[in-house]
């Protein structure tokens, strides 16, 4: 109620200041009477007896007018006027009170005073009910509403209340849980799905709300997708770097030959199981001079054993050169699907080169000392002639097979068929690839890995 008392006392102090600053001689007496009567009766009655002392008959007439006008003015005025309006009305009253005091001393006629006194009391009647309403009704209502709203707003601003229900109540099975990502508080029952007691009590557990968990899953999926895309590009870059160096006519089969180079490890195991492990090991050690050429042949022609079979069959069938050369090209395409049969085809082709009755004789003759010499000669021919003329490779290798495998009978037939077999581009690489299978595969694998590493480093630099 201290605030209410201050609001009621403000107009009285303003009146007192008006009397102090006035130049009239009776201002001191009026000030005393104003204070005494205002303390005894209140604001409305304090002003009227001071006027009665001066002129009792005239104020009686004005009193009735002011009483009639009080309910009208109080009802017409709004209840929510500010203190600024009250101050302005009180200033008007001060000026009005100065004038009648001076006029009463100078003995001005009654006709001039009567119309002015009701005007003086009208602003007083307006100001008095306003101060009462603002002090009692409005002040208490504003304070109570402010306290209620400010407590809720303060709790929400500080993050002490649940985001869903906006309350701070905590029960045994319904505690407030804080999300470690967004730092919002949720009741166990308000959050969907409901939070278990184990998740609340366990200090090791980091709890996230449902919205944050969804966002974290999306971010994890986005980060996993980009590294998956460059993986196939690395595989496609590796053959593109190597294959143009090896052979230009077979550029269409670049991506497929790289995958078959990995699968040839199974073919290698099948040849060892067939009973020729000793012969293949010796032949691989004896043919170390052709490791580089065999590695190139392993990448470019994946169906090498099948083409070797056709070239050796062409050596026996000397009367059909055109058909053998024509058959080698489509088999080079279809041999991509028959990788598992490559080892068996190479064995059958090598047996056909010597004689159809003796099955597995050609691999042991390849390990003789003469074969190494013939291979070195064939390598010299390659170095002199170069890659574009592969016919120089065929006579040395095919004569080696025919001369060592079948002493004198198949020699001329081999020389005649070499002229016909020199036409296709796949025959020289296939005839060279037959003897060296293990080391060529290892070298091919190593070179593929090196190219992949280089491609990966280039991408990281970019």
From Swiss-Prot:
Component of the Integrator complex, composed of core subunits INTS1, INTS2, INTS3, INTS4, INTS5, INTS6, INTS7, INTS8, INTS9/RC74, INTS10, INTS11/CPSF3L, INTS12, INTS13, INTS14 and INTS15. The core complex associates with protein phosphatase 2A subunits PPP2CA and PPP2R1A, to form the Integrator-PP2A (INTAC) complex. There is a cross-link at residues 68, 254 (Glycyl lysine isopeptide (Lys-Gly) (interchain with G-Cter in SUMO2)). GO terms for molecular function: zinc ion binding. Residues 449-462 have a biased composition (Basic residues). Component of the integrator complex, a multiprotein complex that terminates RNA polymerase II (Pol II) transcription in the promoter-proximal region of genes. Its main location: nucleus. The modification Phosphoserine is found at residue 128. Gene3D superfamilies: Zinc/RING finger domain, C3HC4 (zinc finger) (3.30.40.10). The keyword Acyltransferase does not apply. It is found in: Nucleus. A zinc finger (PHD-type) spans 159-215. Dephosphorylated at Ser-128 by the PNUTS-PP1 complex, promoting RNA polymerase II transcription pause-release. This is Integrator complex subunit 12. GO terms for biological process: snRNA 3'-end processing. Belongs to the Integrator subunit 12 family. Residues 59-86, 305-328, 434-443 have a biased composition (Polar residues). Keywords: Isopeptide bond, Metal-binding, Nucleus, Phosphoprotein, Ubl conjugation, Zinc, Zinc-finger.
């Amino acid at each position: 109620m201290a605030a209410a008392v201050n609001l009621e006392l403000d107009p009285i102090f303003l009146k007192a200041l008006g009397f102090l600053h006035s130049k009239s001689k009776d201002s001191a007496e009026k000030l005393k009477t104003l204070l005494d009567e205002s303390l005894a009766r209140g604001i409305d009655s304090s002003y009227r007896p001071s006027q009665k002392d001066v002129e009792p008959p005239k104020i009686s007439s004005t009193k009735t007018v002011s009483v009639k006008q009080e309910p009208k003015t109080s009802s017409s005025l709004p209840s929510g006027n500010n203190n600024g309006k009250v101050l302005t009305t009180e200033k008007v009253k001060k000026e009005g009170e100065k004038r009648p005091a001076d006029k009463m001393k100078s003995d001005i006629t009654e006709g001039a005073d009567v119309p002015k006194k009701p005007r003086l009391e009208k602003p007083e009647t307006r100001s008095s009910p306003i101060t009462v309403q603002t002090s009692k009704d409005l002040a208490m209502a504003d304070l109570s509403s402010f306290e209620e709203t400010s407590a809720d707003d303060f709790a929400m601003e500080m993050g002490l209340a649940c985001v869903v229900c906006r309350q701070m109540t905590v029960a045994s099975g319904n505690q407030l849980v804080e999300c470690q990502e967004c730092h919002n508080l949720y009741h166990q029952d308000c959050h969907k799905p409901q939070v278990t007691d184990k998740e609340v009590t366990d200090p090791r557990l980091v709890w996230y709300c449902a919205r944050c968990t969804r966002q974290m899953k999306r971010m994890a999926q986005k980060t996993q997708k980009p590294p998956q895309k460059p993986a196939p590009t690395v595989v496609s870059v590796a053959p593109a770097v190597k294959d143009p160096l090896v052979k230009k006519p077979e550029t269409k089969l670049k991506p497929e030959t790289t995958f078959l180079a990995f699968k040839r490890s199974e073919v290698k195991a099948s040849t060892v199981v067939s009973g020729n492990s000793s012969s293949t090991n010796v032949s691989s050690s004896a043919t170390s001079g052709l490791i580089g050429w065999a590695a190139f042949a392993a990448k470019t022609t994946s169906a090498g054993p099948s083409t070797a079979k056709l070239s050796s069959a062409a050596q026996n069938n000397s009367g059909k050169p055109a058909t053998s050369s024509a058959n080698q090209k489509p088999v080079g395409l279809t041999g991509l699907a028959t990788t598992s049969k490559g080892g068996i085809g190479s064995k059958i082709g090598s047996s056909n080169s010597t004689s159809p009755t003796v099955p597995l004789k050609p691999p042991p003759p390849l390990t003789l000392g003469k074969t190494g010499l013939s291979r070195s000669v064939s390598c010299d021919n390659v170095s002199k002639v170069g890659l574009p003329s592969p016919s120089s490779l065929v006579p040395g290798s095919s004569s080696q097979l025919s001369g060592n495998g079948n002493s004198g009978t198949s020699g001329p037939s081999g020389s005649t068929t070499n002229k016909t077999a020199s036409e296709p581009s796949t025959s020289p690489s296939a005839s060279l690839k037959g003897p060296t299978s293990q080391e060529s595969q290892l070298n091919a694998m190593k070179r593929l890995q090196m190219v992949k590493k280089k491609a990966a480093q280039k991408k990281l630099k970019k």
